[in-house]
Amino acid sequence: MQNLLEALVSRSLVHDQTPGLQARLAQGPITGYVGFDPTADSLHVGHLLAVMSLAWLQRCGGTPIIVVGGGTGMVGDPSGKRSERPVLSVEEIDRNVAAIRAQLERFVSFEGQNAARVRNNADWLRAIGLMEFLRDVGKHFTVNYMLAKDSVKGRMESGISFTEFSYQLIQAYDFWHLFRSEKCELQMGGSDQWGNITAGAELVSRKDGASVHGLTFPLLTTASGTKFGKTEGGAVWLDPARTSPYKFFQFWLNTDDRDVERLLKFFTFLSVEDIAALLAEQARDPGKRPAQRRLAEDVTARVHGPDVTRSVIEASRILFGGTDLRAASADVLDVLAGEIPSAAVTGDELAALTIADLLVKVGLAASKGEVRRGVAGRGFSLNGAVLESGDAKVAAGDLLAGGYALLQKGKRNYALVKVR
Protein backbone atom coordinates (compact mmCIF):
# COMPACT_ATOMS: atom_id res chain seq x y z
CA MET A 1 0.00 0.00 0.00
CA GLN A 2 1.26 3.47 -0.90
CA ASN A 3 2.69 5.65 1.86
CA LEU A 4 0.55 8.76 2.48
CA LEU A 5 3.45 11.20 2.62
CA GLU A 6 5.05 9.77 -0.51
CA ALA A 7 1.73 9.98 -2.36
CA LEU A 8 1.18 13.61 -1.38
CA VAL A 9 4.79 14.68 -2.02
CA SER A 10 4.71 13.10 -5.50
CA ARG A 11 1.76 15.36 -6.29
CA SER A 12 3.32 18.50 -4.73
CA LEU A 13 0.62 18.52 -2.07
CA VAL A 14 2.89 19.03 0.96
CA HIS A 15 3.89 22.52 2.09
CA ASP A 16 5.14 21.67 5.58
CA GLN A 17 5.19 18.75 8.00
CA THR A 18 6.12 18.15 11.61
CA PRO A 19 9.31 16.19 12.38
CA GLY A 20 8.86 12.46 12.64
CA LEU A 21 5.80 12.14 10.40
CA GLN A 22 7.55 9.93 7.87
CA ALA A 23 8.81 7.62 10.62
CA ARG A 24 5.31 7.37 12.11
CA LEU A 25 3.75 6.53 8.73
CA ALA A 26 6.36 3.83 8.22
CA GLN A 27 4.90 2.07 11.27
CA GLY A 28 1.47 1.69 9.66
CA PRO A 29 -1.77 3.51 8.80
CA ILE A 30 -2.71 6.59 10.78
CA THR A 31 -5.93 8.31 11.76
CA GLY A 32 -6.02 11.94 10.64
CA TYR A 33 -8.45 14.81 10.46
CA VAL A 34 -9.21 18.02 8.62
CA GLY A 35 -11.50 20.72 9.92
CA PHE A 36 -14.11 22.52 7.84
CA ASP A 37 -15.67 25.88 8.65
CA PRO A 38 -19.49 25.71 8.56
CA THR A 39 -20.10 29.39 7.80
CA ALA A 40 -21.81 28.47 4.49
CA ASP A 41 -24.14 25.66 3.51
CA SER A 42 -21.75 24.42 0.83
CA LEU A 43 -18.09 23.77 0.23
CA HIS A 44 -16.39 25.48 -2.71
CA VAL A 45 -13.46 24.44 -4.89
CA GLY A 46 -11.08 26.19 -2.51
CA HIS A 47 -11.86 23.40 -0.02
CA LEU A 48 -10.98 20.60 -2.42
CA LEU A 49 -7.30 20.33 -1.45
CA ALA A 50 -8.40 19.48 2.08
CA VAL A 51 -11.01 17.05 0.80
CA MET A 52 -8.51 15.32 -1.48
CA SER A 53 -6.00 15.00 1.36
CA LEU A 54 -8.61 13.04 3.32
CA ALA A 55 -9.34 10.88 0.29
CA TRP A 56 -5.62 10.12 -0.14
CA LEU A 57 -5.35 9.32 3.57
CA GLN A 58 -8.08 6.71 3.19
CA ARG A 59 -6.59 5.28 -0.01
CA CYS A 60 -3.30 4.83 1.83
CA GLY A 61 -4.97 2.80 4.57
CA GLY A 62 -5.58 5.58 7.08
CA THR A 63 -8.84 6.57 8.73
CA PRO A 64 -10.13 10.06 7.86
CA ILE A 65 -12.02 12.13 10.37
CA ILE A 66 -13.98 15.09 9.06
CA VAL A 67 -14.38 17.67 11.79
CA VAL A 68 -17.09 20.17 10.98
CA GLY A 69 -16.58 23.22 13.14
CA GLY A 70 -20.00 23.64 14.66
CA GLY A 71 -18.31 24.89 17.82
CA THR A 72 -15.34 26.80 16.41
CA GLY A 73 -17.65 28.27 13.78
CA MET A 74 -19.25 30.24 16.59
CA VAL A 75 -15.84 31.85 17.28
CA GLY A 76 -14.22 32.35 13.87
CA ASP A 77 -10.67 31.55 12.77
CA PRO A 78 -8.56 34.70 12.24
CA SER A 79 -6.10 32.87 9.95
CA GLY A 80 -5.90 34.71 6.64
CA LYS A 81 -8.69 37.10 7.63
CA ARG A 82 -8.40 40.88 7.74
CA SER A 83 -11.50 41.43 9.85
CA GLU A 84 -13.75 39.53 12.19
CA ARG A 85 -16.57 37.60 10.60
CA PRO A 86 -20.14 37.65 11.87
CA VAL A 87 -20.93 34.98 14.45
CA LEU A 88 -23.57 32.51 13.26
CA SER A 89 -26.41 31.20 15.38
CA VAL A 90 -26.44 27.60 16.58
CA GLU A 91 -29.36 26.86 14.24
CA GLU A 92 -27.54 28.27 11.19
CA ILE A 93 -24.41 26.28 11.98
CA ASP A 94 -26.34 23.04 12.48
CA ARG A 95 -28.03 23.45 9.08
CA ASN A 96 -24.69 24.11 7.39
CA VAL A 97 -23.05 21.13 9.11
CA ALA A 98 -25.71 18.81 7.70
CA ALA A 99 -25.27 20.17 4.17
CA ILE A 100 -21.47 19.93 4.26
CA ARG A 101 -21.56 16.38 5.54
CA ALA A 102 -23.70 15.36 2.56
CA GLN A 103 -21.17 16.87 0.14
CA LEU A 104 -18.17 15.22 1.80
CA GLU A 105 -19.78 11.80 1.49
CA ARG A 106 -19.06 11.97 -2.26
CA PHE A 107 -15.31 11.93 -1.69
CA VAL A 108 -14.61 9.41 1.05
CA SER A 109 -16.15 6.06 1.92
CA PHE A 110 -18.14 5.72 5.12
CA GLU A 111 -18.00 1.93 4.96
CA GLY A 112 -15.27 -0.64 5.50
CA GLN A 113 -12.46 -1.14 7.97
CA ASN A 114 -11.13 2.42 7.73
CA ALA A 115 -14.48 4.12 7.16
CA ALA A 116 -14.50 7.89 7.31
CA ARG A 117 -16.10 9.53 10.32
CA VAL A 118 -17.81 12.89 10.64
CA ARG A 119 -17.53 14.75 13.90
CA ASN A 120 -19.00 18.09 14.93
CA ASN A 121 -16.72 19.77 17.45
CA ALA A 122 -19.76 21.41 19.01
CA ASP A 123 -20.43 18.01 20.58
CA TRP A 124 -17.46 18.43 22.92
CA LEU A 125 -16.89 22.19 22.90
CA ARG A 126 -20.43 23.03 24.00
CA ALA A 127 -20.01 20.62 26.90
CA ILE A 128 -16.85 22.13 28.42
CA GLY A 129 -17.12 24.96 30.93
CA LEU A 130 -14.98 28.09 30.94
CA MET A 131 -13.20 27.27 34.22
CA GLU A 132 -12.45 23.75 33.05
CA PHE A 133 -11.12 25.04 29.72
CA LEU A 134 -8.83 27.59 31.35
CA ARG A 135 -7.51 24.98 33.77
CA ASP A 136 -7.00 22.14 31.28
CA VAL A 137 -5.97 24.10 28.17
CA GLY A 138 -5.15 27.73 28.90
CA LYS A 139 -2.46 26.98 31.46
CA HIS A 140 -0.37 25.17 28.84
CA PHE A 141 0.09 28.26 26.61
CA THR A 142 1.82 31.56 27.29
CA VAL A 143 0.48 34.77 25.82
CA ASN A 144 3.87 35.25 24.14
CA TYR A 145 3.43 31.90 22.37
CA MET A 146 -0.02 32.88 21.17
CA LEU A 147 1.05 36.35 20.00
CA ALA A 148 3.83 34.83 17.90
CA LYS A 149 1.36 33.04 15.62
CA ASP A 150 1.11 34.58 12.14
CA SER A 151 -2.69 34.52 12.31
CA VAL A 152 -2.51 36.85 15.32
CA LYS A 153 0.42 39.03 14.27
CA GLY A 154 -1.34 39.89 11.03
CA ARG A 155 -4.26 41.35 12.94
CA MET A 156 -2.52 43.28 15.72
CA GLU A 157 -2.75 46.66 14.00
CA SER A 158 -6.34 46.34 12.78
CA GLY A 159 -7.44 44.73 16.02
CA ILE A 160 -8.42 41.22 17.02
CA SER A 161 -11.10 40.27 19.52
CA PHE A 162 -10.40 37.96 22.44
CA THR A 163 -12.86 35.56 20.80
CA GLU A 164 -10.68 35.14 17.72
CA PHE A 165 -7.45 35.38 19.72
CA SER A 166 -8.53 32.28 21.64
CA TYR A 167 -9.33 30.32 18.48
CA GLN A 168 -5.96 28.56 18.38
CA LEU A 169 -6.56 27.15 21.87
CA ILE A 170 -9.97 25.84 20.89
CA GLN A 171 -8.59 24.14 17.76
CA ALA A 172 -5.74 22.75 19.86
CA TYR A 173 -8.34 21.26 22.19
CA ASP A 174 -10.01 19.61 19.17
CA PHE A 175 -6.75 17.82 18.32
CA TRP A 176 -6.24 16.70 21.92
CA HIS A 177 -9.85 15.50 22.20
CA LEU A 178 -9.58 13.47 18.99
CA PHE A 179 -6.26 12.01 20.09
CA ARG A 180 -7.77 10.93 23.39
CA SER A 181 -11.09 9.67 22.05
CA GLU A 182 -10.15 8.25 18.64
CA LYS A 183 -6.35 7.90 18.66
CA CYS A 184 -6.09 10.59 15.99
CA GLU A 185 -2.42 11.38 15.40
CA LEU A 186 -2.48 13.67 12.35
CA GLN A 187 -4.07 17.00 11.52
CA MET A 188 -3.95 18.36 7.98
CA GLY A 189 -4.84 21.79 6.64
CA GLY A 190 -3.84 24.72 4.47
CA SER A 191 -0.52 26.42 5.10
CA ASP A 192 -2.33 29.23 6.93
CA GLN A 193 -3.35 26.62 9.54
CA TRP A 194 0.21 25.73 10.55
CA GLY A 195 0.10 27.74 13.77
CA ASN A 196 -3.19 26.18 14.86
CA ILE A 197 -1.97 22.68 14.00
CA THR A 198 1.29 23.02 15.91
CA ALA A 199 -0.61 24.44 18.90
CA GLY A 200 -2.63 21.23 18.96
CA ALA A 201 0.48 19.07 18.77
CA GLU A 202 1.96 21.11 21.63
CA LEU A 203 -1.13 20.57 23.78
CA VAL A 204 -1.09 16.80 23.23
CA SER A 205 2.60 16.71 24.11
CA ARG A 206 2.12 18.71 27.31
CA LYS A 207 -1.00 16.94 28.55
CA ASP A 208 -0.24 13.37 27.48
CA GLY A 209 3.48 13.31 26.66
CA ALA A 210 2.66 11.91 23.22
CA SER A 211 3.81 12.88 19.74
CA VAL A 212 1.21 13.77 17.14
CA HIS A 213 1.78 15.23 13.73
CA GLY A 214 0.74 17.96 11.34
CA LEU A 215 0.87 18.38 7.59
CA THR A 216 -0.08 21.38 5.50
CA PHE A 217 -0.71 21.73 1.81
CA PRO A 218 0.03 24.85 -0.24
CA LEU A 219 -2.35 27.75 -0.61
CA LEU A 220 -3.28 27.64 -4.25
CA THR A 221 -3.00 30.57 -6.63
CA THR A 222 -3.18 30.47 -10.41
CA ALA A 223 -0.35 31.23 -12.81
CA SER A 224 -1.92 34.65 -13.39
CA GLY A 225 -1.58 35.43 -9.68
CA THR A 226 -5.27 35.24 -8.74
CA LYS A 227 -6.70 33.19 -5.89
CA PHE A 228 -7.75 29.75 -7.09
CA GLY A 229 -11.48 29.15 -7.18
CA LYS A 230 -12.53 32.75 -7.67
CA THR A 231 -14.24 33.95 -10.85
CA GLU A 232 -15.88 37.19 -11.89
CA GLY A 233 -19.08 35.73 -10.52
CA GLY A 234 -17.52 34.86 -7.16
CA ALA A 235 -16.66 31.49 -5.63
CA VAL A 236 -17.21 28.22 -7.50
CA TRP A 237 -19.41 26.11 -5.22
CA LEU A 238 -20.00 22.37 -5.04
CA ASP A 239 -23.73 22.92 -4.47
CA PRO A 240 -25.48 22.86 -7.89
CA ALA A 241 -27.96 25.45 -6.63
CA ARG A 242 -25.08 27.90 -6.13
CA THR A 243 -22.91 26.98 -9.14
CA SER A 244 -24.59 25.00 -11.90
CA PRO A 245 -22.86 21.77 -13.01
CA TYR A 246 -22.38 23.36 -16.44
CA LYS A 247 -20.56 26.39 -15.01
CA PHE A 248 -18.61 24.07 -12.70
CA PHE A 249 -17.46 22.03 -15.70
CA GLN A 250 -16.55 25.15 -17.67
CA PHE A 251 -14.50 26.47 -14.72
CA TRP A 252 -12.18 23.47 -14.93
CA LEU A 253 -12.25 23.33 -18.74
CA ASN A 254 -10.97 26.92 -18.87
CA THR A 255 -7.87 26.11 -16.80
CA ASP A 256 -4.75 27.93 -17.98
CA ASP A 257 -2.22 25.65 -19.72
CA ARG A 258 0.32 26.74 -17.10
CA ASP A 259 -1.87 25.41 -14.28
CA VAL A 260 -3.34 22.23 -15.71
CA GLU A 261 -0.55 19.81 -14.68
CA ARG A 262 -0.66 20.99 -11.08
CA LEU A 263 -4.46 20.84 -10.92
CA LEU A 264 -4.52 17.32 -12.37
CA LYS A 265 -2.14 16.25 -9.61
CA PHE A 266 -4.11 18.06 -6.93
CA PHE A 267 -7.70 17.22 -7.85
CA THR A 268 -7.68 13.84 -9.62
CA PHE A 269 -6.46 10.37 -8.74
CA LEU A 270 -4.78 9.89 -12.10
CA SER A 271 -1.29 8.47 -11.73
CA VAL A 272 1.65 10.78 -12.28
CA GLU A 273 2.47 8.70 -15.36
CA ASP A 274 -1.02 9.11 -16.82
CA ILE A 275 -0.85 12.86 -16.23
CA ALA A 276 2.49 13.00 -18.04
CA ALA A 277 0.94 11.11 -20.98
CA LEU A 278 -1.97 13.59 -21.10
CA LEU A 279 0.44 16.52 -21.17
CA ALA A 280 2.46 14.89 -23.95
CA GLU A 281 -0.75 14.44 -25.95
CA GLN A 282 -1.59 18.08 -25.33
CA ALA A 283 1.84 19.19 -26.51
CA ARG A 284 1.24 17.39 -29.82
CA ASP A 285 -2.17 19.03 -30.37
CA PRO A 286 -2.72 21.94 -27.93
CA GLY A 287 -5.98 23.01 -29.56
CA LYS A 288 -7.84 19.91 -28.39
CA ARG A 289 -6.91 20.59 -24.73
CA PRO A 290 -7.13 16.93 -23.63
CA ALA A 291 -5.63 17.72 -20.23
CA GLN A 292 -8.26 20.35 -19.42
CA ARG A 293 -11.04 18.10 -20.70
CA ARG A 294 -9.93 15.20 -18.53
CA LEU A 295 -9.62 17.51 -15.51
CA ALA A 296 -13.11 18.94 -16.05
CA GLU A 297 -14.71 15.55 -16.62
CA ASP A 298 -13.00 13.92 -13.65
CA VAL A 299 -13.78 16.59 -11.05
CA THR A 300 -17.33 17.24 -12.28
CA ALA A 301 -18.14 13.51 -12.22
CA ARG A 302 -16.88 13.23 -8.67
CA VAL A 303 -18.87 16.23 -7.45
CA HIS A 304 -22.08 15.93 -9.50
CA GLY A 305 -22.06 12.32 -10.69
CA PRO A 306 -21.38 10.71 -14.09
CA ASP A 307 -24.91 11.12 -15.48
CA VAL A 308 -24.99 14.87 -14.87
CA THR A 309 -21.47 15.16 -16.26
CA ARG A 310 -22.45 13.42 -19.49
CA SER A 311 -25.37 15.83 -19.90
CA VAL A 312 -23.08 18.79 -19.26
CA ILE A 313 -20.56 17.57 -21.83
CA GLU A 314 -23.29 17.11 -24.44
CA ALA A 315 -24.71 20.56 -23.66
CA SER A 316 -21.24 22.03 -24.09
CA ARG A 317 -20.87 20.29 -27.45
CA ILE A 318 -24.14 21.82 -28.64
CA LEU A 319 -22.82 25.31 -27.98
CA PHE A 320 -19.34 24.66 -29.30
CA GLY A 321 -20.12 22.24 -32.12
CA GLY A 322 -19.61 18.53 -32.46
CA THR A 323 -23.01 17.01 -31.70
CA ASP A 324 -26.23 16.10 -33.50
CA LEU A 325 -29.03 18.22 -32.05
CA ARG A 326 -31.65 15.63 -32.92
CA ALA A 327 -29.83 13.11 -30.74
CA ALA A 328 -29.74 15.43 -27.72
CA SER A 329 -31.85 14.21 -24.80
CA ALA A 330 -34.31 16.31 -22.83
CA ASP A 331 -31.91 16.16 -19.85
CA VAL A 332 -29.13 17.69 -21.94
CA LEU A 333 -31.41 20.44 -23.21
CA ASP A 334 -32.63 21.07 -19.66
CA VAL A 335 -29.00 21.69 -18.65
CA LEU A 336 -28.58 24.04 -21.59
CA ALA A 337 -31.77 25.93 -20.72
CA GLY A 338 -30.22 26.89 -17.41
CA GLU A 339 -27.19 28.45 -19.09
CA ILE A 340 -28.51 30.42 -22.08
CA PRO A 341 -31.49 32.76 -22.60
CA SER A 342 -34.71 30.75 -22.64
CA ALA A 343 -38.43 31.33 -23.00
CA ALA A 344 -41.45 29.10 -22.53
CA VAL A 345 -44.56 29.21 -24.73
CA THR A 346 -47.75 27.21 -24.96
CA GLY A 347 -48.62 25.15 -28.01
CA ASP A 348 -51.20 27.76 -29.05
CA GLU A 349 -48.65 30.56 -28.71
CA LEU A 350 -46.16 28.60 -30.81
CA ALA A 351 -48.74 28.20 -33.56
CA ALA A 352 -49.39 31.95 -33.58
CA LEU A 353 -45.78 33.19 -33.47
CA THR A 354 -43.36 33.40 -36.38
CA ILE A 355 -39.71 32.52 -35.94
CA ALA A 356 -39.00 36.26 -36.12
CA ASP A 357 -41.37 36.75 -33.17
CA LEU A 358 -39.52 34.07 -31.23
CA LEU A 359 -36.11 35.59 -31.97
CA VAL A 360 -37.32 38.90 -30.59
CA LYS A 361 -38.97 37.19 -27.60
CA VAL A 362 -35.74 35.46 -26.52
CA GLY A 363 -33.63 38.57 -27.09
CA LEU A 364 -31.58 37.42 -30.08
CA ALA A 365 -33.01 40.29 -32.14
CA ALA A 366 -34.30 43.71 -31.21
CA SER A 367 -36.94 43.82 -33.95
CA LYS A 368 -38.36 41.95 -36.90
CA GLY A 369 -36.41 44.32 -39.12
CA GLU A 370 -33.18 43.05 -37.58
CA VAL A 371 -34.37 39.50 -38.22
CA ARG A 372 -35.03 40.26 -41.92
CA ARG A 373 -31.56 41.73 -42.31
CA GLY A 374 -30.00 38.83 -40.44
CA VAL A 375 -31.82 36.23 -42.50
CA ALA A 376 -30.62 37.93 -45.69
CA GLY A 377 -27.07 37.55 -44.40
CA ARG A 378 -27.67 33.94 -43.33
CA GLY A 379 -27.07 34.97 -39.73
CA PHE A 380 -29.88 33.08 -37.95
CA SER A 381 -30.58 29.38 -37.60
CA LEU A 382 -33.16 27.05 -36.08
CA ASN A 383 -31.95 23.74 -34.65
CA GLY A 384 -28.73 24.09 -36.61
CA ALA A 385 -30.37 24.81 -39.98
CA VAL A 386 -29.89 28.26 -41.52
CA LEU A 387 -33.13 30.24 -41.64
CA GLU A 388 -34.42 31.12 -45.08
CA SER A 389 -37.31 33.25 -43.77
CA GLY A 390 -38.27 34.84 -40.50
CA ASP A 391 -41.95 34.56 -41.39
CA ALA A 392 -41.94 30.78 -41.09
CA LYS A 393 -43.28 29.07 -38.00
CA VAL A 394 -41.90 26.29 -35.82
CA ALA A 395 -43.92 23.15 -36.48
CA ALA A 396 -44.38 20.39 -33.92
CA GLY A 397 -42.11 18.19 -36.02
CA ASP A 398 -39.32 20.75 -35.71
CA LEU A 399 -39.13 20.42 -31.93
CA LEU A 400 -36.26 18.65 -30.25
CA ALA A 401 -36.53 16.32 -27.25
CA GLY A 402 -38.41 17.83 -24.33
CA GLY A 403 -40.30 20.23 -26.61
CA TYR A 404 -37.32 22.50 -27.25
CA ALA A 405 -36.27 24.60 -30.24
CA LEU A 406 -32.74 26.02 -30.39
CA LEU A 407 -32.35 29.45 -31.98
CA GLN A 408 -28.96 30.81 -32.93
CA LYS A 409 -27.56 34.18 -34.01
CA GLY A 410 -24.10 34.16 -35.51
CA LYS A 411 -21.61 31.66 -34.12
CA ARG A 412 -21.91 32.14 -30.37
CA ASN A 413 -25.36 33.52 -29.45
CA TYR A 414 -27.99 30.92 -28.55
CA ALA A 415 -31.44 30.78 -26.98
CA LEU A 416 -33.95 28.04 -26.29
CA VAL A 417 -37.71 28.05 -26.65
CA LYS A 418 -39.61 25.38 -24.73
CA VAL A 419 -43.18 24.44 -25.51
CA ARG A 420 -45.10 23.82 -22.30
UniProtKB/Swiss-Prot annotation:
The keyword Nucleotide-binding applies. Keywords: Aminoacyl-tRNA synthetase, ATP-binding, Cytoplasm, Ligase, Nucleotide-binding, Protein biosynthesis, RNA-binding. Residues 353-419 form the S4 RNA-binding domain. Its EC number is 6.1.1.1. Pfam families: SYY_C-terminal, tRNA-synt_1b. GO terms for biological process: tyrosyl-tRNA aminoacylation. A motif ('KMSKS' region) lies at residues 227-231. SUPFAM superfamilies: Alpha-L RNA-binding motif, Nucleotidylyl transferase. It catalyses: tRNA(Tyr) + L-tyrosine + ATP = L-tyrosyl-tRNA(Tyr) + AMP + diphosphate + H(+). One of its GO terms (cellular component) is cytosol. ATP binds at residue 230. Its main location: cytoplasm. It is found in: Cytoplasm. HAMAP family: Tyr_tRNA_synth_type1. Homodimer. NCBIfam families: tyrS (TIGR00234). This is Tyrosine--tRNA ligase. The gene is tyrS.
